[in-house]
UniProtKB/Swiss-Prot annotation:
Endpoints of the signal sequence: none
Localization per Swiss-Prot or TrEMBL: Cytoplasm, Cytosol; Nucleus
Comp. bias intervals (Acidic residues): 691-710, 742-754
Function recorded in the entry: Key component of the ribosome quality control complex (RQC), a ribosome-associated complex that mediates the extraction of incompletely synthesized nascent chains from stalled ribosomes as well as their ubiquitin-mediated proteasomal degradation. Thereby, frees 60S subunit ribosomes from the stalled translation complex and prevents the accumulation of nascent polypeptide chains that are potentially toxic for the cell.
Organism expressing this protein natively: Homo sapiens (Human)
Polar residues bias: start-end ranges: 777-795
Principal location listed in the UniProt entry: cytoplasm
Gene name in the database record: NEMF
Compositionally biased region (Basic and acidic residues): 429-439, 755-768, 839-854, 937-965
Tissue-specificity statement: Expressed in brain, heart, liver, lung, spleen, and skeletal muscle. Also expressed at lower levels in stomach and testis.
Gene3D superfamilies: ibrinogen binding protein from staphylococcus aureus domain (2.30.310.10)
Phosphothreonine modification, residue list: T7
Designated name of the protein: Ribosome quality control complex subunit NEMF
Length: 1076
């Protein structure tokens, strides 16, 4: 199968690209993989996509190729330099397979150079061919050239066009070539035409396509070869302005079948592509296209699907070959047993015909042995007797005294002597081969064919010295009867074995065809690239696998009405509950999304049970309050976070089955929103199911891997608080002085807008003030008793704060100067007797890295906490001197021009005065974070207490806003409700099942699923765990044949993609399944 461009292919496609793409501007650059890139080109009323694969191909494409979620560094560099630039030229460098695309002109030009030979390369250079970026760094030691950034690309090293070979040079090449080598192989490395064109030209001039270099090539033949090369040169010149057609050459494969009367099926697969229909392909099936560029696009786009067909065809051939081998083996066994019967019968008859000779030989040898004559002397005696013409001695051919046997050559005494003497030597050799053990399989098979008995010919017969002649004859007849019985049994067993093998082969063929058809029909949905599941109330929940996916989820898929769910733990995923209807999302779905956020975090490995929280879509933003940069996957959350109850670290693994449209009606309402009574019933049934599973585990029916049994788990106690107002929480803190000051400042200032800063996923940092020690991570003891009762503390703290600040809020209050604040700090004046309780709440809030920022007079607050450092006074003095003539309006105007958030900060502060309510409680987090957050020095200086996080969708963009992929995903989102009804975990026996999708979700969502296992933190790798679960499903008594086929069709990589870390698999009767 042809896999890459030849020189003539390259010249033809370049001619077509120059005719269609020149003058178009680059819209964007994408990468399919590390070697394949897409350049989106456009001009008014026309768009095109140019596909480049390093070392392989260049062509435009009309097919939708999968693009990487985040562009590679090489694609980003190409975007930076090539975007919006016009394609000026596309030319070949010399006659090498190197293409130079020029974007832009003069000094603003950039060159993209693609190498299509060897391992290939893609190089981005400026107008002077200085390398800006390169796909594969290398050094050409032969030419002493280094291919690296800031080096100049060596254009002069490209192979220049050479004149046609002379007759003398061609004669030398043929003379020096090894004898027996194909002529086209000898010429191909020396000429730029390619093997297909050389073979075509040889055929056109009367040569065979496989003509070899040997003595038969005379001078006139070499002249004809030179004429052929001249034709090849004419073809090369034709491709410089190529505007012809394209051809895909096909290969016919015969599909094997078990049924003899069934007509033969042919499978046509793509084999090669060419800009011309060459002579060697004229008799082959082919497809003609209006342009070579379209032919290449069709070839490479369909080749992956054909690989699946070829793989299936190969598996079918192997299955039928095994069946054929079984058939041949049984035939050979039966034939060998039949021959053994005939030989034993013939030997018995020959002994009966030569009774006297056989008895005499037995007596002679017995007497010699009785007289204790040496075995070698007995052999010498026999040879002497043979020399004297003794008939008995002449019949003895070999003494096998170690086995108490004598080999005799017996013949039919009733035949004429002339007939007896024919081919005696050959028969003796045959019989010797018969007695000797064969060496190797080939000899054994040949011997079996030569062992056919020949009547009326002398035959070597082994005679037992311990038996008489009649007894020896009877022994051979007994062997013959035994072989006959064995033959009958073998025939019966062979029929059963062959039927079993045929049945197994049919099953294999059916499975291969089923898996192939499922793989082709399988549609990958847009949400499968993320972590995902469908809640028990038919809501789609998606989560990011890494920081980049978190960014994409919030940017592309967080729409009005959706809910954002997260957990304050390292590595926790950003979850989005898709809510296209905009109706309030039920608590059960919120809880399940919170479980997902926790399980895909560090809590899974640490086995920590804590709470997640959720916010509305408009509370999530990418804009920090001071205009500071938030890293990828980090957001701002403004406003109140709604905490969920603590969740167990318990996931489930199962399959969703895609049912045909005609069967969807059976499954509508399977995941409907339940009312409270139904919810309580479901909860009771869930509880009873879990209890029964635990009982089965204790009885030995439920098991996990052996490693899990040896594992020592640290118990984690969780108390669920039901009465919030009756609980008391005692908080201890080593930072009383700082917290007292914070309470005083909070009670004396307006309550500003709550803002929080959260570093998502892998960002691990610290939030600390001066004099504080870094929080240890992780805590070994976790007390969750403060999860629910925190609300009472919030109420108490807010009431006392509001009572202290009511007077100052009703009228304009005087702001404290930095000096007064420092004096207050020294005196440690408490603002109220109730501040102690608020202090405890503040201290707990500080430990969970959620800090409150008041936007008014931020600089004064900073001065109160942090005294001015060395050198700042002189710096402030210079700034006052520099900006002494600048009023507030000028400053605000300049800040807007610079894009700073300084002016917005004041506006937010003003809004905060009017909009904030009097009794808004202080927000706390229920759980200590997994680690502090590190914030830049600038943020620490200006905003001592930054809070978490959020996002406005228009504030940032990760990729091209007009990306087609995004539009397709959004289109798919519109049909989600119908799609989810067709995905069921409870297949009906009469359903038409199309394919199965593995799903990993909170275990509570799988209450009614037909197949499910429970996953908890353990030591088993997720790949092995997925196979264990699949094996359990395959051996289920309820599994139908179609469901097993669908299970088999799922790829191993898809099975374990969404399983969180190392797990323990639990299910009823799992141990019994493992033993099978």
């Amino acid at each position: 199968m042809k896999s890459r461009f030849s020189t003539i292919d390259l010249r033809a496609v370049l001619a077509e690209l120059n005719a269609s793409l020149l003058g178009m501007r680059v819209n964007n650059v994408y990468d399919v993989d590390n070697k394949t890139y897409l350049i989106r080109l456009q001009k008014p009323d026309f768009k095109a996509t140019l596909l480049l694969e390093s070392g392989i191909r260049i062509h435009t494409t009309e097919f939708e190729w999968p693009k990487n979620m985040m562009p590679s560094s090489f694609a980003m560099k190409c975007r930076k330099h090539l975007k919006s630039r016009r394609l000026v030229s596309a030319k070949q460098l010399g006659v090498d397979r190197i293409v130079d695309f020029q974007f832009g002109s003069d000094e603003a030009a950039y060159h993209l150079i693609i190498e299509l030979y060897d391992r290939g390369n893609i190089v981005l250079t400026d107008y002077e061919y200085v390398i800006l970026n390169i796909l594969r760094f290398r050094t050409d030691e032969a030419d002493d050239v280094k291919f690296a950034v800031r080096e100049r690309y060596p254009l002069d090293h490209a192979r220049a066009a050479e004149p046609l070979l002379t007759l003398e040079r061609l004669t030398e090449i043929v003379a020096s070539a090894p004898k027996g080598e194909l002529l086209k192989r000898v010429l191909n490395p020396l000429l730029p035409y390619g093997p297909a064109l050389i073979e075509h030209c040889l055929l056109e001039n009367g040569f065979s396509g496989n003509v070899k270099v040997d003595e038969k090539l005379e001078t006139k033949d070499i002249e004809k070869v030179l004429v052929s090369l001249q034709k090849a040169e004419d073809y090369m010149k034709t491709t410089s302005n190529f505007s012809g057609k394209g051809y895909i050459i096909q290969k016919r494969e015969i599909k094997p079948s078990l049924e003899a009367d069934k007509p033969v099926e042919d499978i046509l697969t793509y084999e090669e592509f060419h800009p011309f229909l060459f002579s060697q392909h004229s008799q082959c099936p082919y497809i003609e296209f209006e342009s070579f560029d379209k032919a290449v696009d069709e070839f490479y786009s369909k080749i992956e699907g054909q690989k699946i067909d070829l793989k299936a065809l190969q598996q079918e051939k192997q299955a039928l070959k095994k069946l054929d081998n079984v058939r041949k083996d049984h035939e050979n066994r039966l034939e060998a047993l039949q021959q053994a019967q005939e030989i034993d019968k013939l030997k018995g008859e020959l002994i009966e015909m030569n009774l006297q000779i056989v008895d005499r030989a037995i007596q002679v040898v017995r007497s010699a042995l009785a007289n204790q004559i040496d075995w070698t002397e007995i052999g010498l005696i026999v040879k002497e007797a043979q020399a004297q013409g003794d008939p008995v001695a002449s019949a003895i051919k070999e003494l096998k005294l170690q086995t108490n046997h004598v080999t005799m050559l017996l013949r039919n005494p009733y035949l004429l002597s002339e007939e007896e003497d024919d081919d005696v030597d050959g028969d003796v050799n045959v019989e010797k081969n018969e007695t000797e053990p064969p060496k190797g399989k080939k000899k054994k098979q040949k011997n079996k064919q030569l062992q056919k008995p020949q009547k009326n010919k002398p035959l070597l017969v082994d005679v037992d010295l311990s038996l008489s002649a009649y007894a020896n004859a009877k022994k051979y007849y007994d062997h013959k009867r035994y072989a006959a019985k064995k033959t009958q049994k073998t025939v019966e067993a062979a029929e059963k074995a062959f039927k079993s093998a045929e049945k197994k082969t049919k099953q294999t063929l059916k499975e291969v065809q089923t898996v192939t058809s499922i793989q082709k029909a399988r549609k990958v949905y847009w949400f499968e690239k993320f972590l995902w599941f469908i809640s028990s109330e038919n809501y789609l929940i998606i989560g990011g696998r890494d920081q980049q996916q978190n960014e994409i989820i919030v940017k592309r898929y967080l729409t009005p009405g959706d809910i954002y769910v997260h957990a304050d733990l390292h590595g926790a995923t950003s979850c989005v509950i898709k809510n296209p209807t905009g109706e309030p999302i039920p608590p059960r779905t919120l809880t399940e999304a919170g479980t997902m956020a926790l399980c895909y975090s560090a809590a899974w490995d640490a086995r920590v049970i804590t709470s997640a929280w959720w916010v509305y879509h408009h509370q999530v933003s990418k804009t920090a309050p001071t205009g500071e940069y938030l890293t990828t996957g980090s957001f701002m959350i403004r406003g109140k976070k709604n905490f969920l109850p603590p969740s167990y670290l318990m996931m489930g693994f199962s399959f969703l089955f895609k049912v045909d449209e005609s069967c969807v009606w059976r499954h509508q309402g399977e995941r409907k929103v339940r009312v409270q009574d139904e919810d309580m019933e479901t909860l009771a049934s869930c509880t009873s199911e879990l209890i029964s599973e635990e009982m089965e585990q204790l009885d030995g029916g439920d098991t996990s891997s052996d490693e899990d049994k040896e594992e020592h788990e640290t118990p984690v106690e969780v108390e669920l608080m039901t009465q919030v107002d009756q609980e008391d929480i005692t908080l201890q803190s080593g930072r009383d002085e700082l917290n007292e000051e914070l309470i005083q400042e909070e009670s004396s200032e307006d309550e500003g807008e709550y803002e929080e800063v959260r570093k998502d996923q892998d960002s691990v940092g610290e939030m600390k003030d001066e004099g504080e020690e870094t929080l240890n991570y992780p805590d070994t003891t976790i007390d969750l008793s403060h999860l629910q009762p925190q609300r009472s503390i919030q109420k108490l703290a807010s009431k006392e704060e509001s009572s202290n600040s009511s007077d100052s809020k009703s009228q304009s209050r005087r702001h404290l100067s930095a000096k007064e604040r420092r004096e207050m700090k020294k005196k440690k004046l408490p603002s109220d007797s109730g501040d102690l309780e608020a202090l405890e709440g503040k201290d707990k809030e500080k430990e969970s890295t959620v800090h409150i920022e008041t936007h008014q007079n931020t600089s004064k607050n900073v001065a109160a906490v942090q005294p001015m450092k060395r050198g700042q006074k002189s710096k402030m003095k210079k700034m006052k001197e520099k900006y002494k003539d600048q009023d507030e309006e000028d400053r605000e105007l300049i800040m807007k021009l610079l894009g700073s958030a300084g002016s917005n900060k004041e506006e937010k502060g003003k809004k905060g005065k009017k909009g904030k309510t009097k009794d808004e409680p202080v927000k706390k987090q229920p759980q200590k974070p997994r680690g502090g957050q590190r914030v830049s020095d600038n943020i620490k200086k200006e905003t001592p207490f930054l809070e978490v996080i959020t996002h406005e969708l228009q504030d940032f963009a990760v990729d091209d806003p007009h990306d087609d992929k995004e539009e397709q995903d959004l289109d798919q989102q519109g049909n989600e409700e119908n799609l989810f009804d067709s995905l069921t975990g409870q297949p009906h026996p009469e359903d038409v099942l199309l394919f199965a999708i593995p799903i990993c979700a909170p275990y509570t969502t799988m209450t009614n699923y037909k197949y499910k296992v429970k996953l908890t933190p353990g030591v088993q790798k997720k790949g092995k765990a997925a196979k264990t679960a699949l094996n359990s499903f395959m051996h289920s008594k309820e599994a139908t044949a179609r469901e097993k086929d669908l299970f088999r069709s799922v790829k191993d990589t898809d099975l374990s993609r969404n399983i969180p870390g190392k797990v323990k698999v639990s299910a009823p009767n799992l141990l019994n399944v493992k033993r099978k």
